[in-house]
Amino acid sequence: MTTRFDLDGGAVGFVESSSAVPLVSLVVSVRSGALADPEGKDGVCRFAARMLRRGADGMTAQEIEATIDRLGAELALDVGPSTVSLHGQVIRRNVEPFVELITRLLGKPAFADEEIARLRRETAAELVESRDSDRALANLAFRRALFAGHPYSRSAAGRPSTIAGIERDDVVAAYEKHFVRGDVVIGFAGAITEDEAKRHGDSLAAAVREGERVATRPPEPEKKEGRRLVFVDKPERTQTQTLIGSLGTWPHDDDHFPLVTATAVLGGTFTSRMMREIRSKRGWSYGTSARLSIERRRHAFTMSAAPGAADCAPCVELELALLEDFVGKGITKRELGFIKNYLVRSYAFEVDTAPKRLGQAVETELLELPADYHTRYVDHVRAVTLETANAAAATRLSAKDVVIIVVGTAADTLEAVQKKIPDLASTDVVPFDAD
């Protein structure tokens, strides 16, 4: 069982001890992320976090990387709208020096001008390279369209234009804003005791300065009416990417788990409605799914597919028809019985390792989820009835008020797609390489 404990200065710690393997996983997170980037400085939070391992406390970037390798460790970074997390793993005998290294990275980053210039160039190149991924383009366009005017529309990675304007003062300001002790959440999993975790947690928390906590609780996103098509125009696309969606769920909704369960019927398994109709019957897309994302505020419901260019228009038409049927008629008793059994049984794979169990506890803390969100997941699913599942789909979702994203070649595909969308309210064509 994951144990929660308080650390100095308002930081919070977790430990999930296990002797299964001689490894220790750790995570150091803060309760703020890209939502707090200043206007015109999109990407600066992630930029500052990446700079932590590019020089600290007299160590160069090369020396830091060599130390990580020598310890047999791994260290990765994840930056989202509301959180920043450093994830590490190391063999047990090297926990002490690994924690010492991370303490130095957190507490005394150098932010050398030459490293900032190098990372600025690398980030700009990565953003350009990301345009090679049609899926990434679809996700970016969807987020910007669905959450237009809301902080959730912004990309943690930033834009080429904003990255170009990031200077050292911006990086230092972002570091000082986000890395404050009262916002720190630290977790350990694996071959480590509770006493050891508390001792190492105190060392890590002490490395971070005390300061004013960041308020990253954005307003509730606004629902936008009508079917709105955004076509991301990219040359020579023989395959397309589609995303159809709207606002979805919030973990504190009374009907959250009924909607999660119903959505799994629509597109959450290999035998879901979408897989059966789009892949198995018609062969239009190898993969297709529906999902709900969670955040501190209501986030997105999405349906995705990747049909060939010739099949894109009928595939979009079918997805909209499936959504209309799902919202209007709901799911069947047989479908509900199957999906509840599937979700309950497969949950074992969500908690079969100490790092996974730790991850659930940390996520609950960071995203302010209900305290029993993960610990009583199975009970929540079992409590879903046909009435609550269908009411949730009908209440929370709409087939009439959706964003429709297509990444393809407009000259070949746009007109056909438009003809297959009844009651289309608007169309925007966006160049794939737009900032």
Model-identified regions with their sequence ranges:
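N- or domain-start disorder-to-order transition segments that initiate the globular core
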Residues: 1-24
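M16/insulysin-pitrilysin zinc metalloprotease superfamily fold
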Residues: 54-58, 88-122, 269, 289, ...
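Buried hydrophobic packing residues in well-ordered domains
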Residues: 10, 28, 46-48, 68, ...
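Histidine-acidic residue clusters that define the catalytic metal-binding segment
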Residues: 1-5, 126, 144-184, 216-221, ...
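An aromatic/glycine/proline-enriched structural segment found at the starts
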Residues: 148, 152, 156, 180-181, ...
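C-terminal regions of mature proteins
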Residues: 2, 185-191, 302, 340-435
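M16/MPP (pitrilysin/insulinase) zinc-metallopeptidase core fold and M16-derived inactive scaffolds
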Residues: 25-92, 132, 155, 268-284, ...
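Acidic/histidine-enriched segments that form metal/cofactor-coordinating
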Residues: 65-174, 195, 203, 220-222, ...
